[in-house]
């Protein structure tokens, strides 16, 4: 009987350690994905903090956005008015 209780206790401790390890790995990965909003500076000047905050902003290149096509293929039953043209992605429906 004590052997069974010891085995269950060891399994529970192992499970707790595994869960904590996974929790900290996910926490660190999510923490690393966030960018710092401002740099902490001792005796900071508000202008420097504003510059540090805005210097880390990323610019989005317009070339990275996929070109949208105007789709005329959306039609309804003959008794209804046709839908206005819409912008759809090339890979829509995939």
From Swiss-Prot:
InterPro entries hit by this protein: FAM24 (IPR028122)
Keyword set includes Disulfide bond: no
Signal is among the record's keywords: yes
Entry keyword set: Secreted, Signal
Main location class: secreted
A Gene Ontology cellular-component term: extracellular region
Signal peptide (UniProt feature, chain positions): 1-21
Subcellular location as annotated: Secreted
Protein family per UniProt: Belongs to the FAM24 family.
Protein name, entry field: Protein FAM24B
């Amino acid at each position: 009987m004590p052997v069974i209780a010891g085995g269950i206790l060891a399994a529970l401790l192992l499970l707790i350690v595994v869960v904590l390890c996974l929790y900290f790995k996910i926490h660190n990965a999510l923490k690393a994905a966030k960018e710092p909003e401002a740099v902490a500076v001792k005796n900071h000047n508000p202008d420097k903090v504003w510059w540090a905050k805005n210097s880390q902003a990323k610019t989005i290149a317009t070339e990275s956005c996929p070109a949208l096509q105007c789709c005329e293929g959306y039609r309804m039953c003959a008794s209804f008015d046709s839908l206005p043209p819409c912008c759809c992605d090339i890979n829509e429906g995939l």
